């Protein structure tokens, strides 16, 4: 069914109070959006970090009398009579179907294609990874995933062991296996990611060569010829002592999930253990690669 949304602009400090006010006025859900499209990364545990200039959006049933909603909100001390707002009627959509319709096969490097599992492959002779991300991150559409896939495609992975640290949907580990790796190991803190990776591995016929672990279950002595970690700059810095010991001597490391402005600090965390290559950038993101000393 169609919906009505009411949008308010406020400061991050007042956003939670206005969220409560919208719920009390009958909103069925609340969304926070940055007015200026400024990214927020890596909040502290338990922290809900909001932008300095925040849009608070309440979603209402189409039958709601919005004049009554506005009258209720005018009594709020942060708003008052005649407060600025915007009301829009939203078209009813099958959002899952719309997302699926807009997810098309994508090529990375010379050989590799990532294809939605519900679409035909564009090149039968290419290295095709059939993907259904489910509830986990990783479709290839994000610049960081794209950077990692292009890097993997550029390598000779024949017979190699690959670790995908923070595997999400399993896209990188599965791509490595399809590109010739003998074995891949996926590690993620999210059980849903482990399940999504397992499902995608089965879909691609590589489940017998993919090991999946939550961090608490991973073997103590794990080594690989290639290690790729597409997470975020903060965890990459904090986990550098752990990640740095995973590649064998002479092994390769690929890191992403890093803003270009964060590259220097991440490089510093790995410089003692790796001979690092020049940083590669895509949009505002980057990839760091190197060889183990």
Swiss-Prot record:
PANTHER family: ELECTRON TRANSFER FLAVOPROTEIN BETA SUBUNIT LYSINE METHYLTRANSFERASE (PTHR43648:SF1). Belongs to the methyltransferase superfamily. PrmA family. InterPro entries: Ribosomal_L11_MeTrfase_PrmA (IPR050078), Ribosomal_PrmA_MeTrfase (IPR004498), SAM-dependent_MTases_sf (IPR029063). It is an enzyme of class 2 (transferase). Its EC number is 2.1.1.-. GO terms for biological process: methylation. It catalyses: L-lysyl-[protein] + 3 S-adenosyl-L-methionine = N(6),N(6),N(6)-trimethyl-L-lysyl-[protein] + 3 S-adenosyl-L-homocysteine + 3 H(+). S-adenosyl-L-methionine binds at residues 145, 166, 188, 230. It is found in: Cytoplasm. Pfam families: PrmA (PF06325). Its main location: cytoplasm. The gene is prmA. It comes from the Bacteria. One of its GO terms (cellular component) is cytosol. SUPFAM superfamilies: S-adenosyl-L-methionine-dependent methyltransferases (SSF53335). It comes from Escherichia coli (strain 55989 / EAEC). Keywords: Cytoplasm, Methyltransferase, S-adenosyl-L-methionine, Transferase. Methylates ribosomal protein L11. GO terms for molecular function: protein-lysine N-methyltransferase activity. This is Ribosomal protein L11 methyltransferase.
């Amino acid at each position: 069914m169609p919906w009505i949304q009411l949008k308010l602009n406020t400061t991050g400090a007042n956003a939670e109070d206005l969220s409560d006010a919208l719920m009390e006025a009958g909103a069925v859900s609340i969304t926070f959006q940055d007015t200026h499209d400024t990214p927020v990364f890596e909040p502290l545990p338990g922290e809900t970090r909001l932008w300095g200039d925040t849009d608070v959006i309440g979603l209402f049933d189409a039958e709601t009398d919005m004049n009554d909603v506005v009258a209720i909100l005018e009594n709020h001390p942060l708003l008052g009579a005649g407060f600025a707002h915007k009301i829009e009627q939203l078209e009813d959509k099958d959002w899952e179907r719309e997302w699926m319709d807009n997810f098309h096969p994508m090529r990375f490097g010379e050989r590799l294609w990532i294809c939605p599992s519900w679409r035909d492959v564009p090149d039968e002779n290419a290295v095709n990874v059939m993907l259904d991300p489910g509830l986990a991150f990783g479709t290839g559409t994000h610049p960081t995933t794209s950077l990692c896939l292009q890097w993997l495609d550029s390598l000779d992975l024949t017979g190699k062991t690959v670790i995908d640290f923070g595997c999400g949907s399993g896209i990188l580990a599965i791509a490595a296996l399809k590109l010739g790796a003998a074995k891949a190991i996926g590690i993620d803190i999210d059980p849903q990611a482990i399940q999504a990776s397992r499902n995608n591995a089965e879909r691609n016929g590589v489940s017998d060569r993919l090991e999946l672990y939550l961090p608490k279950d991973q073997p103590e002595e794990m080594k690989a010829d290639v290690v790729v970690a597409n997470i975020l700059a903060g965890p990459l810095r904090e986990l550098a002592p752990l990640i740095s010991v995973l590649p064998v001597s002479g092994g390769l490391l690929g890191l992403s999930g890093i803003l270009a402005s964060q590259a220097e600090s991440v490089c510093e965390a790995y410089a003692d253990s790796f001979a690092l290559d020049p940083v590669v950038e895509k949009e505002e993101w980057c990839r760091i690669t190197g060889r183990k000393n």
